[in-house]
UniProtKB/Swiss-Prot annotation:
GO BP terms: glycogen catabolic process
Gene: glgX
Keyword annotations from UniProtKB, A to Z: Carbohydrate metabolism, Glycogen metabolism, Glycosidase, Hydrolase
Species lineage: Bacteria, Pseudomonadati, Pseudomonadota, Gammaproteobacteria, Enterobacterales
InterPro entries with a match to the protein in the record: GlgX_C, GlgX_Isoamylase_N_E_set, Glyco_hydro_13_cat_dom, Glyco_hydro_13_N, Glyco_hydro_b, Glycogen_debranch_bac, Glycogen_debranch_GlgX, Glycoside_hydrolase_SF
HAMAP family in the cross-refs: GlgX
Biased composition (Basic and acidic residues): 458-467
Protein name: Glycogen debranching enzyme
Length: 657
């Protein structure tokens, strides 16, 4: 039998050099590491990794080729109270594997035991890693590098975006290939999107609890192999990487960036009753935040929390991010529950992973977006991330909904959010683009559901409607559910228009949820993470062409307004913005705090947003000049000069002079 050579301790993972494969694995507490390779008949061959450099175990297998299936058995103490859960009976996934073969089914053999070890061997059913070779012709691909001030983000799910698209070939719907199809790219271009932000595409697993209920993890926030693409989105799992890169190359040619939603905060191993796939059996004590009793700190709500202050875990996370940029040419990341990235365990702007990203010549040049919270004490960190990061702005989301749907927000608070929440983000040299403004996201009501439902309806998730937030700031306009009278439909449409206008014409970086421009509904489900069905798939045949055109017109209007694209904080007297009352006069202090919800926002001295968020039709006197309403609030031809606007209840209009 071929013997392993010592090999090299870097880089991590399995790497083919044309003559064989070098294997490396980090484990600070292991006593022995076996490389397990499987032949075409499934026969297992074990080799002790002979190299041990610091905490890196390594070996070189001559004559090994791409396509080789492998895993690890890691020997060490079973001492749960100290955080050690080694179990060599369980085949483990290489954390840096580029491809996984097999399914993560709910099976007792894929668990290692809670208090007592389960020594039943699981190699027959355990997923296997696959050695890959990386040869790809990027041609003349170059990142679009869209300036932050010009960025329009579109948050979408790989499958849900195209699975029901009638103009995309059936055989590629719901896949990476569909993202790069000309029909999809033309749609994004016509809409005005500059960045496609994808929900997780790294390999993930469905939680055992969901599998037992006949459900699956649809969103993908349950990672198991951070360097491997999720194969279910590929036409052929063996070519997933090239399919993904083909899509990115096509999107780049159209000037569209690709941002990945990435989950570095926890793993699919869940809590101590969860499965054993990889990290827990390789070095539980190093990879996770461990309590004094040996259990996990659950700062994520998912059972475990990755210790991103441990040097080896920082190296792992940094290598993962570099891989997606260097190998797949992605243009940035949105970090799920990103406060975990800064935990030491308290949150720090100079936490090790933040410092590593800032000092990396690759990662410091891409777009970085934080979901700036986790669920632990001190986890709400909106506005506190390092200057390289933009952040989801939940202040904007709640303010926009409260202003237009709950009618309980003063003008001053609304204006503050409209002006990129400068009270939150104007610090440490950050620009207005640091505020990622959103009204909706994958997590929560869709825009249509915001105006059709007062309450969540998550019964299909199997938790008796207990899951999902109750703080929705929604308004069903008098009737719970879709449909209704013509008057009801029109009032809901007006609210949608008001929310979209506020989102797309405010200062900061707008993020649009895919389907909101169609009128997509999830029928009141505000936590559809486990609904891989028509509840979440965009039904293009039912898309509202009028709403899509309205959204596109707003986006293209935004690109014409210097005050929004120049990405500079607005200052008194700089000509970027003036705040006026219904009589075109500056607002008084009392009007800001207690006045009627009527406001005129003059941008770049040429564009005027007139707002009447009261219950009555109100006459709004426009500032001096020849004003005419512009698309999407009026047609292109024969503009009518207006000095006074008869503002409908809960209405708004945009004018130009």
């Amino acid at each position: 039998m071929t013997q392993l050579a010592i090999g090299k301790p870097a880089p991590l993972g399995a790497h083919y050099d044309g003559q064989g494969v070098n294997f490396t694995l980090f484990s600070a507490h292991a006593e022995r590491v076996e490389l397990c390779v499987f032949d075409a008949n499934g026969q297992e061959h074990r080799y002790d990794l002979p190299g041990h450099s610091g905490d890196i175990w390594h070996g070189y297998l001559p004559d090994a080729r791409p396509g080789l299936r492998y895993g690890y058995r890691v020997h060490g103490p079973w001492q749960p109270a100290e955080g050690h859960r080694f179990n060599p009976a369980k085949l483990l996934i290489d954390p840096c594997a580029r491809q996984i073969e097999g399914e993560f089914k709910d099976n007792p053999l894929l668990h290692a035991g809670h208090n007592e070890p389960d020594y039943r061997d699981n190699a027959a059913i355990a997923p296997k890693c696959v050695v890959v070779v990386d040869h790809y012709d990027w041609e003349d691909d170059a990142p679009p590098r869209t300036p932050w001030g010009s960025t329009i983000i579109y948050e979408a799910h790989v499958k849900g975006l195209t699975y029901l698209h009638p103009e995309i070939p059936v055989e590629i719907r719901g896949t990476y290939k569909a993202l790069g199809h000309p029909v999809m790219i033309n749609y994004l271009k016509q809409l005005g999107i500059t960045a496609l932000e994808l929900l997780p595409v790294a390999q993930f697993a469905s939680e055992p609890r969901l599998q037992r209920m006949g459900l699956s993890n649809y969103w993908g926030y349950n990672p198991v192999a951070m360097f491997a693409l999720h194969p279910a989105y590929a036409c052929s799992p063996e070519t997933a990487l090239d399919e993904f890169r083909d899509a990115i190359k096509a999107l780049h040619k159209a000037g569209i960036e690709v941002i990945l939603d990435i989950v570095l905060n926890h793993s699919a191993e869940l809590d101590l009753d969860g499965p054993l796939f990889s990290l827990r059996g390789i070095d539980n004590r190093s990879y996770y935040w461990i309590r004094e009793d040996g259990d996990y700190h659950n700062w994520t709500g998912c059972g475990n929390t990755l210790n991103l202050s441990h040097p080896a875990v920082v190296d792992y996370a940094s290598a993962c991010l570099r891989y997606w940029v260097e190998t797949c040419h992605v243009d940035g990341f949105r970090f799920d529950l990103a406060a975990v990235m800064g935990r030491t365990p308290e949150f720090r702007q100079d936490a090790p992973l933040f410092t590593a990203i800032q000092n990396c010549p690759v990662l410091s040049q891409v777009k970085l977006i934080a979901e700036p919270w986790d669920i632990a004490p001190g986890g709400y960190q909106v506005g506190n991330f390092p200057p390289l990061f933009a952040e989801w702005n939940d202040h904007f989301r709640d303010a926009a909904r409260r202003f237009w749907l709950h009618y309980d927000l003063p003008l001053g608070a609304f204006a503050g959010r409209f002006a990129a929440s400068s009270d939150v983000f104007k610090r440490n040299g950050r620009l207005p683009s640091a505020a990622i403004n959103l009204v909706t996201a994958h997590d929560g009501f869709t825009l249509r559901d915001c105006v059709c439902f007062n309450h969540k309806h998550n019964e299909a998730n199997g938790e008796e409607n207990r899951d999902g937030t109750n703080n929705n700031y929604s308004n069903n306009h008098g009737k719970e559910g879709l449909g209704g009278s013509l008057d009801l439909v029109e009032r809901r449409r007006d609210s949608i228009h008001a929310l979209l206008t506020t989102l797309l014409l405010s200062q900061g970086t707008p993020m649009l949820l895919a389907g909101d421009e169609h009128g997509h509904s999830q029928h009141g489900n505000n936590n559809a993470y486990c609904q891989d069905n028509q509840l979440t798939w965009l039904d293009w045949s039912q898309a509202s062409s009028g709403l899509t055109a309205f959204t596109a017109a707003l986006i293209h209007l935004r690109k014409r307004i210097p005050a929004l694209v120049e990405n500079r904080w607005w200052e008194e007297g700089d000509g970027n913005v003036r705040w006026l009352n219904r009589y075109a006069q500056p607002l008084s202090t009392d009007e800001w705090q207690n006045g009627p919800k009527q406001l005129q926002i003059l941008l770049s001295d040429r564009f005027l947003i007139a707002i009447n968020a009261t219950l009555e039709v109100t006459e709004i006197v426009l500032p001096a000049g020849e004003w005419h309403a512009i698309p999407p609030f009026a047609g292109e031809d024969n503009p009518v000069i207006t000095a006074v606007w008869q503002g409908p209840a809960h209405g708004l209009c945009v004018f130009q002079r």
